[in-house]
């Protein structure tokens, strides 16, 4: 029996913006409220997550997160409107393709 596999990613002007790993990062930031907590949840280094976000923003040409520095009042990170849109778009596409792949897999 064969397994059907696929990868989804979003590009802008031929540059990678968001794939499954990036969607997991944005989702974790959304739920955890900080890059540090998100990186711990995902088992990734803070530096890796930070660099990934910076590359995503550079390739997109706009911010996907708003960072509030730590200090006495804490700090945190939230998704921008564009970050929310990208995450929602990725999840819709990934889910739709997953449904098609599941149906095709049942036909074997």
State what each model feature region is:
Residues 2-14:
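Short, Lys/Arg-enriched N-terminal segment that forms or immediately precedes the first helix
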Residues 29-40:
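Short helix-boundary/capping micro-motifs
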Residues 52:
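Residues within the DNA-recognition helix of helix-turn-helix
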Residues 58-63:
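Residue cluster at the C-terminal edge of the helix-turn-helix DNA-binding motif
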Residues 67-90:
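Basic, amphipathic "hinge/linker" alpha-helix immediately C-terminal to the N-terminal HTH DNA-binding motif
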Residues 86-107:
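Alpha-helical linker/hinge and terminal dimerization helices associated
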